Protein backbone atom coordinates (compact mmCIF):
# COMPACT_ATOMS: atom_id res chain seq x y z
CA UNK A 1 0.00 0.00 0.00
CA UNK A 2 1.51 3.31 -1.07
CA UNK A 3 2.18 6.22 1.26
CA UNK A 4 0.08 8.42 -1.04
CA UNK A 5 -2.90 6.14 -0.54
CA UNK A 6 -2.40 6.09 3.20
CA UNK A 7 -2.39 9.88 3.20
CA UNK A 8 -5.55 9.87 1.06
CA UNK A 9 -7.53 7.92 3.62
CA UNK A 10 -5.99 9.82 6.51
CA UNK A 11 -3.67 7.18 7.96
CA UNK A 12 -0.10 8.21 8.76
CA UNK A 13 2.64 6.10 7.23
CA UNK A 14 3.81 4.48 10.46
CA UNK A 15 0.59 4.47 12.46
CA UNK A 16 -0.70 0.96 13.14
CA UNK A 17 -4.28 0.00 12.49
CA UNK A 18 -6.24 0.50 15.67
CA UNK A 19 -8.92 -2.05 16.38
CA UNK A 20 -11.48 -2.37 19.13
CA UNK A 21 -14.42 -0.34 17.85
CA UNK A 22 -16.65 -2.19 20.26
CA UNK A 23 -14.61 -1.45 23.43
CA UNK A 24 -16.06 0.10 26.57
CA UNK A 25 -18.00 3.14 25.42
CA UNK A 26 -17.37 5.59 28.29
CA UNK A 27 -13.67 6.09 27.49
CA UNK A 28 -12.82 9.59 26.26
CA UNK A 29 -10.14 10.24 23.65
CA UNK A 30 -10.30 6.64 22.52
CA UNK A 31 -9.09 5.93 18.99
CA UNK A 32 -10.75 3.84 16.29
CA UNK A 33 -10.08 3.10 12.65
CA UNK A 34 -13.38 3.99 10.99
CA UNK A 35 -15.02 4.34 7.64
CA UNK A 36 -16.59 7.75 7.11
CA UNK A 37 -19.97 6.05 7.44
CA UNK A 38 -18.90 4.49 10.73
CA UNK A 39 -17.58 7.82 11.99
CA UNK A 40 -21.00 9.37 11.35
CA UNK A 41 -22.68 6.46 13.12
CA UNK A 42 -20.42 6.54 16.17
CA UNK A 43 -20.64 10.31 16.35
CA UNK A 44 -24.42 10.06 16.36
CA UNK A 45 -24.44 7.42 19.11
CA UNK A 46 -22.06 9.47 21.25
CA UNK A 47 -24.19 12.59 20.64
CA UNK A 48 -27.23 10.98 22.28
CA UNK A 49 -29.00 9.43 19.30
CA UNK A 50 -32.35 7.80 20.07
CA UNK A 51 -33.25 6.50 16.62
CA UNK A 52 -31.82 5.93 13.15
CA UNK A 53 -34.18 5.44 10.22
CA UNK A 54 -32.92 4.37 6.82
CA UNK A 55 -33.37 2.40 3.65
CA UNK A 56 -30.19 0.64 2.49
CA UNK A 57 -28.36 2.21 -0.43
CA UNK A 58 -24.69 2.49 -1.38
CA UNK A 59 -22.72 4.37 -0.09
CA UNK A 60 -24.86 5.02 3.02
CA UNK A 61 -25.69 1.49 4.19
CA UNK A 62 -22.84 1.06 6.66
CA UNK A 63 -24.07 3.92 8.86
CA UNK A 64 -27.14 2.02 9.98
CA UNK A 65 -25.38 -1.36 10.02
CA UNK A 66 -22.73 0.03 12.39
CA UNK A 67 -25.40 1.29 14.77
CA UNK A 68 -27.25 -2.03 14.55
CA UNK A 69 -24.10 -3.82 15.72
CA UNK A 70 -22.91 -1.39 18.39
CA UNK A 71 -23.32 -2.49 22.04
CA UNK A 72 -24.23 0.98 23.28
CA UNK A 73 -27.06 1.12 20.75
CA UNK A 74 -28.39 -2.13 22.18
CA UNK A 75 -27.87 -0.97 25.76
CA UNK A 76 -29.78 2.26 25.11
CA UNK A 77 -32.37 0.56 22.91
CA UNK A 78 -31.71 2.99 20.06
CA UNK A 79 -34.22 2.42 17.28
CA UNK A 80 -32.20 0.88 14.43
CA UNK A 81 -34.53 -1.10 12.16
CA UNK A 82 -34.67 -0.60 8.40
CA UNK A 83 -37.57 1.41 6.99
CA UNK A 84 -39.67 0.49 3.96
CA UNK A 85 -38.37 3.48 1.99
CA UNK A 86 -36.71 6.85 2.48
CA UNK A 87 -39.98 8.76 2.81
CA UNK A 88 -41.23 6.58 5.65
CA UNK A 89 -37.79 6.84 7.26
CA UNK A 90 -37.86 10.64 7.06
CA UNK A 91 -41.35 10.83 8.53
CA UNK A 92 -40.59 8.41 11.37
CA UNK A 93 -37.47 10.37 12.29
CA UNK A 94 -39.52 13.56 12.25
CA UNK A 95 -41.95 11.89 14.64
CA UNK A 96 -39.13 11.02 17.02
CA UNK A 97 -37.86 14.61 16.81
CA UNK A 98 -41.39 15.80 17.63
CA UNK A 99 -41.07 13.90 20.91
CA UNK A 100 -37.84 15.71 21.80
CA UNK A 101 -35.48 12.86 20.94
CA UNK A 102 -32.47 13.03 18.66
CA UNK A 103 -33.06 11.25 15.35
CA UNK A 104 -31.10 10.58 12.18
CA UNK A 105 -32.23 9.63 8.66
CA UNK A 106 -29.75 7.94 6.31
CA UNK A 107 -30.01 7.38 2.57
CA UNK A 108 -28.10 7.53 -0.66
CA UNK A 109 -28.47 10.62 -2.78
CA UNK A 110 -31.30 9.36 -5.00
CA UNK A 111 -33.19 8.46 -1.84
CA UNK A 112 -33.55 12.19 -1.27
CA UNK A 113 -35.91 12.22 -4.24
CA UNK A 114 -38.16 9.73 -2.45
CA UNK A 115 -37.96 11.58 0.87
CA UNK A 116 -38.30 15.05 -0.67
CA UNK A 117 -41.91 15.74 0.33
CA UNK A 118 -41.31 15.03 4.01
CA UNK A 119 -37.79 16.49 3.92
CA UNK A 120 -38.78 19.89 2.54
CA UNK A 121 -41.80 20.17 4.82
CA UNK A 122 -39.72 19.23 7.87
CA UNK A 123 -37.94 22.55 7.36
CA UNK A 124 -41.35 24.19 7.69
CA UNK A 125 -42.43 22.34 10.84
CA UNK A 126 -39.01 22.69 12.39
CA UNK A 127 -37.71 20.27 15.00
CA UNK A 128 -37.96 19.58 18.70
CA UNK A 129 -35.22 17.01 19.22
CA UNK A 130 -32.22 17.33 16.93
CA UNK A 131 -32.77 15.92 13.43
CA UNK A 132 -29.96 15.13 10.97
CA UNK A 133 -30.61 13.93 7.42
CA UNK A 134 -27.54 12.12 6.08
CA UNK A 135 -27.34 11.93 2.28
CA UNK A 136 -24.45 9.95 0.80
CA UNK A 137 -23.78 11.15 -2.74
CA UNK A 138 -22.14 9.00 -5.40
CA UNK A 139 -20.05 11.11 -7.82
CA UNK A 140 -18.95 8.98 -10.80
CA UNK A 141 -22.02 6.79 -10.22
CA UNK A 142 -20.16 3.78 -8.79
CA UNK A 143 -23.50 2.25 -7.84
CA UNK A 144 -26.16 4.73 -8.90
CA UNK A 145 -28.27 6.03 -11.79
CA UNK A 146 -27.03 9.62 -11.52
CA UNK A 147 -24.58 11.84 -9.65
CA UNK A 148 -27.02 14.43 -8.29
CA UNK A 149 -25.66 16.67 -5.55
CA UNK A 150 -27.63 16.73 -2.30
CA UNK A 151 -26.43 20.23 -1.47
CA UNK A 152 -29.09 21.44 -3.90
CA UNK A 153 -31.72 19.91 -1.61
CA UNK A 154 -30.32 21.80 1.36
CA UNK A 155 -30.51 25.09 -0.53
CA UNK A 156 -33.97 24.21 -1.85
CA UNK A 157 -35.28 23.50 1.66
CA UNK A 158 -33.39 26.53 3.05
CA UNK A 159 -31.67 24.54 5.79
CA UNK A 160 -28.00 24.34 6.87
CA UNK A 161 -25.77 21.74 5.22
CA UNK A 162 -22.65 20.15 6.70
CA UNK A 163 -20.00 18.49 4.53
CA UNK A 164 -17.09 16.92 6.45
CA UNK A 165 -13.60 17.01 4.98
CA UNK A 166 -12.33 14.02 6.97
CA UNK A 167 -13.52 11.09 9.04
CA UNK A 168 -12.57 12.94 12.22
CA UNK A 169 -14.70 15.86 11.14
CA UNK A 170 -17.57 13.51 10.28
CA UNK A 171 -17.49 12.21 13.86
CA UNK A 172 -17.14 15.64 15.46
CA UNK A 173 -19.83 17.23 13.31
CA UNK A 174 -22.56 14.92 14.56
CA UNK A 175 -22.70 16.41 18.05
CA UNK A 176 -22.28 19.90 16.62
CA UNK A 177 -25.06 19.34 14.08
CA UNK A 178 -27.48 17.90 16.65
CA UNK A 179 -26.85 20.88 18.93
CA UNK A 180 -27.31 23.23 15.98
CA UNK A 181 -30.59 21.57 15.00
CA UNK A 182 -31.95 21.92 18.52
CA UNK A 183 -30.73 25.46 18.99
CA UNK A 184 -32.34 26.71 15.77
CA UNK A 185 -35.26 24.23 15.76
CA UNK A 186 -34.49 23.16 12.20
CA UNK A 187 -33.39 19.90 10.53
CA UNK A 188 -29.89 19.88 9.06
CA UNK A 189 -28.45 17.98 6.11
CA UNK A 190 -25.17 16.08 6.37
CA UNK A 191 -23.65 15.43 2.94
CA UNK A 192 -21.12 12.64 2.38
CA UNK A 193 -19.58 11.38 -0.85
CA UNK A 194 -18.50 7.85 -1.74
CA UNK A 195 -14.79 8.33 -1.00
CA UNK A 196 -15.56 9.85 2.39
CA UNK A 197 -18.11 7.16 3.22
CA UNK A 198 -15.94 4.22 2.18
CA UNK A 199 -12.39 5.19 3.17
CA UNK A 200 -10.91 4.70 6.64
CA UNK A 201 -9.01 6.96 9.00
CA UNK A 202 -8.11 7.08 12.66
CA UNK A 203 -10.78 8.91 14.65
CA UNK A 204 -10.38 10.16 18.21
CA UNK A 205 -13.67 9.99 20.06
CA UNK A 206 -14.95 12.31 22.75
CA UNK A 207 -17.47 12.38 25.56
CA UNK A 208 -20.55 10.20 25.33
CA UNK A 209 -23.75 12.20 25.81
CA UNK A 210 -26.96 10.84 27.30
CA UNK A 211 -30.09 10.76 25.10
CA UNK A 212 -32.69 13.49 25.50
CA UNK A 213 -35.70 12.87 27.73
CA UNK A 214 -39.04 12.77 25.97
CA UNK A 215 -40.75 16.15 25.63
CA UNK A 216 -43.51 17.70 23.54
CA UNK A 217 -42.86 20.70 21.26
CA UNK A 218 -43.28 24.07 22.96
CA UNK A 219 -45.46 25.23 20.04
CA UNK A 220 -47.29 22.12 18.78
CA UNK A 221 -49.41 24.22 16.44
CA UNK A 222 -46.32 24.83 14.28
CA UNK A 223 -46.52 21.20 13.19
CA UNK A 224 -49.95 21.54 11.58
CA UNK A 225 -49.05 22.81 8.11
CA UNK A 226 -52.38 24.26 7.14
CA UNK A 227 -51.90 27.36 4.95
CA UNK A 228 -52.42 29.80 7.83
CA UNK A 229 -49.66 28.05 9.80
CA UNK A 230 -47.40 27.30 6.83
CA UNK A 231 -47.26 30.96 5.81
CA UNK A 232 -46.02 31.95 9.27
CA UNK A 233 -43.54 29.09 9.35
CA UNK A 234 -42.24 30.09 5.93
CA UNK A 235 -41.64 33.63 7.18
CA UNK A 236 -39.82 32.23 10.21
CA UNK A 237 -37.60 30.03 8.05
CA UNK A 238 -36.75 32.93 5.76
CA UNK A 239 -35.92 35.12 8.76
CA UNK A 240 -33.55 32.41 10.02
CA UNK A 241 -31.44 32.57 6.86
CA UNK A 242 -29.43 35.53 8.18
CA UNK A 243 -28.61 33.54 11.32
CA UNK A 244 -27.59 30.49 9.29
CA UNK A 245 -25.29 32.66 7.16
CA UNK A 246 -23.71 34.35 10.19
CA UNK A 247 -23.13 30.94 11.77
CA UNK A 248 -21.48 29.64 8.60
CA UNK A 249 -19.19 32.67 8.38
CA UNK A 250 -18.06 32.10 11.96
CA UNK A 251 -18.09 28.30 11.92
CA UNK A 252 -15.12 26.29 13.13
CA UNK A 253 -15.63 24.17 10.01
CA UNK A 254 -15.23 27.07 7.57
CA UNK A 255 -11.69 28.38 7.71
CA UNK A 256 -9.73 30.94 5.70
CA UNK A 257 -5.97 30.38 5.65
CA UNK A 258 -3.80 33.01 4.00
CA UNK A 259 -0.90 32.11 1.71
CA UNK A 260 2.18 33.74 0.24
CA UNK A 261 1.09 33.48 -3.42
CA UNK A 262 -2.05 35.52 -4.14
CA UNK A 263 -2.12 34.77 -7.85
CA UNK A 264 -4.62 32.06 -6.96
CA UNK A 265 -7.11 31.49 -4.18
CA UNK A 266 -8.51 27.98 -3.65
CA UNK A 267 -11.99 27.27 -2.30
CA UNK A 268 -12.07 23.62 -1.20
CA UNK A 269 -15.38 22.05 -0.18
CA UNK A 270 -15.67 18.95 1.97
CA UNK A 271 -13.34 16.14 0.97
CA UNK A 272 -11.72 18.40 -1.64
CA UNK A 273 -9.87 20.09 1.23
CA UNK A 274 -8.34 16.76 2.23
CA UNK A 275 -7.27 16.12 -1.36
CA UNK A 276 -5.81 19.60 -1.71
CA UNK A 277 -3.71 19.51 1.44
CA UNK A 278 -2.37 16.06 0.55
CA UNK A 279 -0.23 17.76 -2.10
CA UNK A 280 1.28 20.35 0.27
CA UNK A 281 3.10 18.73 3.17
CA UNK A 282 4.44 22.09 4.33
CA UNK A 283 1.25 24.06 3.76
CA UNK A 284 -0.43 25.38 0.64
CA UNK A 285 1.27 28.48 -0.85
CA UNK A 286 -2.09 29.84 -2.01
CA UNK A 287 -4.81 31.25 0.24
CA UNK A 288 -7.31 28.48 1.01
CA UNK A 289 -10.95 28.76 2.04
CA UNK A 290 -12.16 25.49 3.52
CA UNK A 291 -15.95 25.14 3.28
CA UNK A 292 -17.74 22.46 5.30
CA UNK A 293 -20.82 24.33 6.53
CA UNK A 294 -23.44 26.01 4.36
CA UNK A 295 -24.98 28.50 3.50
CA UNK A 296 -21.88 29.55 1.60
CA UNK A 297 -19.85 31.91 3.85
CA UNK A 298 -20.12 34.90 1.52
CA UNK A 299 -17.96 37.24 3.61
CA UNK A 300 -15.07 34.78 3.54
CA UNK A 301 -15.46 34.36 -0.22
CA UNK A 302 -15.34 38.12 -0.71
CA UNK A 303 -12.30 38.37 1.54
CA UNK A 304 -10.47 35.87 -0.64
CA UNK A 305 -11.66 37.50 -3.88
CA UNK A 306 -10.38 40.89 -2.72
CA UNK A 307 -6.82 39.62 -2.35
CA UNK A 308 -6.48 36.95 -5.05
CA UNK A 309 -6.21 37.36 -8.81
CA UNK A 310 -8.05 34.14 -9.68
CA UNK A 311 -10.27 31.74 -7.74
CA UNK A 312 -10.24 27.96 -8.17
CA UNK A 313 -13.24 26.07 -6.80
CA UNK A 314 -12.74 22.42 -5.82
CA UNK A 315 -15.85 20.42 -4.94
CA UNK A 316 -16.82 16.77 -5.35
CA UNK A 317 -20.09 16.75 -7.26
CA UNK A 318 -21.93 19.43 -9.17
CA UNK A 319 -20.52 23.00 -9.41
CA UNK A 320 -22.82 24.18 -6.62
CA UNK A 321 -20.39 26.57 -4.93
CA UNK A 322 -18.88 27.67 -8.23
CA UNK A 323 -22.30 28.79 -9.46
CA UNK A 324 -23.04 30.52 -6.15
CA UNK A 325 -19.78 32.45 -6.29
CA UNK A 326 -20.48 33.67 -9.81
CA UNK A 327 -23.68 35.15 -8.41
CA UNK A 328 -22.00 36.64 -5.33
CA UNK A 329 -19.05 38.26 -7.12
CA UNK A 330 -19.86 40.81 -9.79
CA UNK A 331 -16.41 42.34 -10.21
CA UNK A 332 -15.25 40.34 -13.21
CA UNK A 333 -13.03 38.11 -11.08
CA UNK A 334 -11.80 35.00 -12.92
CA UNK A 335 -13.33 31.89 -11.41
CA UNK A 336 -12.09 28.47 -12.44
CA UNK A 337 -13.57 25.06 -11.79
CA UNK A 338 -15.93 22.54 -13.34
CA UNK A 339 -17.78 25.12 -15.41
CA UNK A 340 -14.61 26.31 -17.12
CA UNK A 341 -12.90 22.95 -17.62
CA UNK A 342 -9.98 23.15 -15.18
CA UNK A 343 -11.78 20.42 -13.21
CA UNK A 344 -13.66 17.70 -15.17
CA UNK A 345 -17.38 18.47 -15.45
CA UNK A 346 -18.44 14.90 -14.70
CA UNK A 347 -17.18 12.25 -12.33
CA UNK A 348 -15.80 12.39 -8.83
CA UNK A 349 -13.06 14.74 -7.76
CA UNK A 350 -9.65 13.09 -7.36
CA UNK A 351 -6.23 14.19 -6.13
CA UNK A 352 -5.03 13.92 -9.74
CA UNK A 353 -7.75 16.36 -10.86
CA UNK A 354 -6.50 18.85 -8.30
CA UNK A 355 -2.86 18.49 -9.36
CA UNK A 356 -3.87 19.23 -12.95
CA UNK A 357 -6.07 22.18 -11.97
CA UNK A 358 -3.23 23.72 -9.96
CA UNK A 359 -0.77 23.20 -12.81
CA UNK A 360 1.55 21.17 -10.59
CA UNK A 361 3.68 18.21 -11.56
CA UNK A 362 2.22 14.92 -10.43
CA UNK A 363 4.21 12.42 -8.42
CA UNK A 364 5.70 9.53 -10.36
CA UNK A 365 3.36 6.57 -10.38
CA UNK A 366 4.80 3.07 -10.58
CA UNK A 367 2.90 0.44 -12.57
CA UNK A 368 1.34 -2.39 -10.55
CA UNK A 369 3.46 -5.52 -10.24
CA UNK A 370 0.52 -7.68 -11.29
CA UNK A 371 -2.68 -7.02 -13.15
CA UNK A 372 -5.83 -7.92 -11.27
CA UNK A 373 -8.09 -10.35 -13.08
CA UNK A 374 -11.11 -8.40 -14.41
CA UNK A 375 -14.32 -8.96 -12.46
CA UNK A 376 -17.18 -7.55 -14.53
CA UNK A 377 -20.54 -7.27 -12.75
CA UNK A 378 -22.54 -10.48 -12.93
CA UNK A 379 -25.28 -12.32 -11.10
CA UNK A 380 -23.78 -14.72 -8.56
CA UNK A 381 -23.47 -18.37 -9.50
CA UNK A 382 -26.50 -20.13 -8.10
CA UNK A 383 -28.60 -16.94 -7.94
CA UNK A 384 -32.33 -17.43 -8.41
CA UNK A 385 -32.50 -14.37 -10.67
CA UNK A 386 -30.49 -16.35 -13.25
CA UNK A 387 -33.11 -19.07 -13.51
CA UNK A 388 -35.90 -16.50 -13.54
CA UNK A 389 -34.36 -14.64 -16.48
CA UNK A 390 -33.63 -17.87 -18.33
CA UNK A 391 -37.32 -18.79 -18.15
CA UNK A 392 -38.56 -15.29 -19.02
CA UNK A 393 -36.25 -15.07 -22.03
CA UNK A 394 -37.29 -18.43 -23.39
CA UNK A 395 -41.01 -17.65 -23.17
CA UNK A 396 -40.68 -14.15 -24.61
CA UNK A 397 -38.94 -15.51 -27.70
CA UNK A 398 -42.40 -16.72 -28.68
CA UNK A 399 -43.55 -13.10 -29.03
CA UNK A 400 -42.41 -10.71 -31.72
CA UNK A 401 -42.10 -7.45 -29.77
CA UNK A 402 -41.98 -8.17 -26.06
CA UNK A 403 -40.73 -5.56 -23.60
CA UNK A 404 -39.39 -6.09 -20.08
CA UNK A 405 -39.24 -3.11 -17.71
CA UNK A 406 -36.89 -3.73 -14.80
CA UNK A 407 -35.99 -2.05 -11.55
CA UNK A 408 -33.20 -1.30 -9.07
CA UNK A 409 -31.57 -4.37 -7.57
CA UNK A 410 -29.23 -7.28 -8.31
CA UNK A 411 -31.61 -8.31 -11.10
CA UNK A 412 -30.66 -5.10 -12.95
CA UNK A 413 -27.66 -7.17 -14.06
CA UNK A 414 -30.09 -9.02 -16.31
CA UNK A 415 -29.29 -6.28 -18.82
CA UNK A 416 -25.79 -7.73 -19.30
CA UNK A 417 -24.76 -10.86 -21.22
CA UNK A 418 -25.69 -13.64 -21.32
CA UNK A 419 -29.27 -12.62 -20.56
CA UNK A 420 -29.87 -9.24 -22.24
CA UNK A 421 -33.33 -9.62 -20.76
CA UNK A 422 -34.46 -6.10 -19.82
CA UNK A 423 -35.17 -2.89 -21.69
CA UNK A 424 -35.32 -0.19 -18.99
CA UNK A 425 -34.10 0.66 -15.48
CA UNK A 426 -34.96 4.15 -14.24
CA UNK A 427 -35.73 4.39 -10.53
CA UNK A 428 -37.13 2.44 -7.61
CA UNK A 429 -40.59 1.13 -8.51
CA UNK A 430 -40.60 2.31 -12.13
CA UNK A 431 -40.81 -1.21 -13.55
CA UNK A 432 -44.49 -1.69 -12.76
CA UNK A 433 -45.65 1.79 -13.67
CA UNK A 434 -43.63 1.86 -16.90
CA UNK A 435 -45.02 -1.54 -17.86
CA UNK A 436 -48.50 -0.17 -17.18
CA UNK A 437 -47.87 2.94 -19.29
CA UNK A 438 -46.49 0.82 -22.13
CA UNK A 439 -49.56 -1.42 -21.96
CA UNK A 440 -51.77 1.67 -22.02
CA UNK A 441 -50.00 2.60 -25.27
CA UNK A 442 -50.78 -0.82 -26.76
CA UNK A 443 -47.63 -2.81 -25.93
CA UNK A 444 -48.06 -6.59 -25.55
CA UNK A 445 -46.58 -8.40 -23.80
CA UNK A 446 -45.60 -5.82 -21.21
CA UNK A 447 -43.61 -7.39 -18.38
CA UNK A 448 -42.25 -5.83 -15.18
CA UNK A 449 -39.39 -7.36 -13.19
CA UNK A 450 -38.94 -6.08 -9.64
CA UNK A 451 -37.38 -7.41 -6.43
CA UNK A 452 -39.16 -8.07 -3.15
CA UNK A 453 -37.53 -5.16 -1.30
CA UNK A 454 -38.01 -2.70 -4.16
CA UNK A 455 -41.64 -3.80 -4.46
CA UNK A 456 -42.41 -2.82 -0.87
CA UNK A 457 -40.23 0.29 -1.21
CA UNK A 458 -42.18 1.86 -4.07
CA UNK A 459 -43.79 -0.79 -6.26
CA UNK A 460 -47.06 -1.30 -4.39
CA UNK A 461 -48.63 2.01 -5.44
CA UNK A 462 -47.88 1.22 -9.09
CA UNK A 463 -49.53 -2.16 -8.67
CA UNK A 464 -52.60 -0.44 -7.22
CA UNK A 465 -52.80 1.79 -10.31
CA UNK A 466 -52.58 -1.27 -12.53
CA UNK A 467 -55.28 -3.11 -10.55
CA UNK A 468 -57.59 -0.09 -10.61
CA UNK A 469 -57.46 -0.06 -14.42
CA UNK A 470 -57.06 -3.83 -14.89
CA UNK A 471 -53.96 -3.18 -16.98
CA UNK A 472 -52.77 -6.02 -19.16
CA UNK A 473 -49.35 -6.52 -17.57
CA UNK A 474 -47.39 -9.37 -16.05
CA UNK A 475 -45.34 -8.56 -12.96
CA UNK A 476 -42.45 -10.76 -11.86
CA UNK A 477 -41.49 -10.13 -8.23
CA UNK A 478 -38.16 -11.93 -7.98
CA UNK A 479 -38.10 -12.73 -4.27
CA UNK A 480 -34.69 -13.57 -2.79
CA UNK A 481 -35.96 -12.97 0.76
CA UNK A 482 -33.60 -10.06 1.41
CA UNK A 483 -32.27 -6.75 0.15
CA UNK A 484 -29.45 -8.42 -1.71
CA UNK A 485 -27.67 -5.68 -3.64
CA UNK A 486 -26.70 -3.72 -0.52
CA UNK A 487 -25.52 -6.69 1.51
CA UNK A 488 -28.48 -8.73 2.70
CA UNK A 489 -30.56 -6.41 4.87
CA UNK A 490 -34.06 -7.42 5.97
CA UNK A 491 -36.83 -6.92 3.42
CA UNK A 492 -40.12 -5.47 4.64
CA UNK A 493 -42.30 -7.85 2.63
CA UNK A 494 -40.57 -11.14 3.40
CA UNK A 495 -43.14 -13.94 3.67
CA UNK A 496 -46.08 -11.63 2.89
CA UNK A 497 -45.86 -10.76 -0.80
CA UNK A 498 -48.84 -12.91 -1.78
CA UNK A 499 -51.03 -11.35 0.91
CA UNK A 500 -49.90 -7.85 -0.05
CA UNK A 501 -50.70 -8.41 -3.73
CA UNK A 502 -54.05 -9.97 -2.90
CA UNK A 503 -54.87 -7.10 -0.53
CA UNK A 504 -54.12 -4.61 -3.29
CA UNK A 505 -56.60 -6.42 -5.49
CA UNK A 506 -54.78 -8.94 -7.67
CA UNK A 507 -56.96 -12.01 -8.25
CA UNK A 508 -55.61 -14.86 -6.05
CA UNK A 509 -55.58 -17.31 -8.96
CA UNK A 510 -53.23 -14.98 -10.81
CA UNK A 511 -50.68 -14.74 -8.00
CA UNK A 512 -48.32 -17.60 -8.81
CA UNK A 513 -45.35 -18.73 -6.72
CA UNK A 514 -42.53 -20.86 -8.11
CA UNK A 515 -39.06 -21.93 -6.98
CA UNK A 516 -36.54 -20.75 -9.60
CA UNK A 517 -34.33 -23.78 -10.15
CA UNK A 518 -33.20 -25.51 -13.36
CA UNK A 519 -35.28 -28.57 -12.46
CA UNK A 520 -38.39 -26.36 -12.34
CA UNK A 521 -37.73 -24.69 -15.71
CA UNK A 522 -40.74 -26.18 -17.49
CA UNK A 523 -43.07 -25.25 -14.63
CA UNK A 524 -41.73 -21.67 -14.63
CA UNK A 525 -42.14 -21.32 -18.39
CA UNK A 526 -45.70 -22.64 -18.28
CA UNK A 527 -46.65 -20.22 -15.50
CA UNK A 528 -45.08 -17.25 -17.30
CA UNK A 529 -46.80 -18.20 -20.55
CA UNK A 530 -50.21 -18.59 -18.88
CA UNK A 531 -50.00 -15.27 -17.04
CA UNK A 532 -48.84 -13.34 -20.11
CA UNK A 533 -51.88 -14.68 -21.97
CA UNK A 534 -54.20 -13.66 -19.14
CA UNK A 535 -55.81 -10.31 -19.97
CA UNK A 536 -55.32 -8.35 -16.77
CA UNK A 537 -52.88 -7.91 -13.90
CA UNK A 538 -50.97 -11.02 -12.93
CA UNK A 539 -48.12 -11.51 -10.48
CA UNK A 540 -45.48 -14.24 -10.61
CA UNK A 541 -43.23 -14.68 -7.56
CA UNK A 542 -40.07 -16.74 -8.21
CA UNK A 543 -38.91 -17.30 -4.62
CA UNK A 544 -35.52 -18.60 -3.55
CA UNK A 545 -33.17 -17.22 -0.90
CA UNK A 546 -30.23 -15.11 -2.03
CA UNK A 547 -27.25 -17.43 -2.45
CA UNK A 548 -25.06 -15.12 -0.35
CA UNK A 549 -27.41 -14.91 2.63
CA UNK A 550 -28.05 -18.66 2.34
CA UNK A 551 -24.31 -19.29 2.70
CA UNK A 552 -24.14 -16.94 5.66
CA UNK A 553 -27.10 -18.60 7.36
CA UNK A 554 -25.55 -22.02 6.73
CA UNK A 555 -22.29 -20.96 8.39
CA UNK A 556 -24.18 -19.54 11.36
CA UNK A 557 -26.03 -22.83 11.87
CA UNK A 558 -22.74 -24.74 11.90
CA UNK A 559 -21.18 -22.49 14.54
Locate the predicted segments by residue.
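Flexible, low-complexity linker and terminal segments
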Residues: 12-37, 47, 164-379, 384-385, ...
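Thiamine diphosphate
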Residues: 18-167, 195, 259, 285, 415-539, 547-554, ...
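Short helix-loop-beta junction
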Residues: 68-73, 277-288, 499-507
Amino acid sequence: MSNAFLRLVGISEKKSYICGIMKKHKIMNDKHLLLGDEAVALGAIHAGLSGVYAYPGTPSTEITEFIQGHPLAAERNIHRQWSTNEKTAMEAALGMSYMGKRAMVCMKHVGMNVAADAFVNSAMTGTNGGLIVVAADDPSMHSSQNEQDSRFYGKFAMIPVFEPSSQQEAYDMMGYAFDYSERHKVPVLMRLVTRMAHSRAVVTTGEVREPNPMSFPSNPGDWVLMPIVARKRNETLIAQQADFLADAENSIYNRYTDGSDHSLGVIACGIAYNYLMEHFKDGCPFPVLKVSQYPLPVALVRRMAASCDTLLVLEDGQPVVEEMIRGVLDNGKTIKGRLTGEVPRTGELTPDNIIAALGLKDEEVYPPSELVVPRPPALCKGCGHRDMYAAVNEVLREYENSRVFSDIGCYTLGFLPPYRAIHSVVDMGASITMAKGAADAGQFPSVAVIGDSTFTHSGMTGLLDAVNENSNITIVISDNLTTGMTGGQDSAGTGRLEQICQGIGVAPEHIRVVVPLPKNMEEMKNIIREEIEYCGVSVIIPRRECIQTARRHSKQKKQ
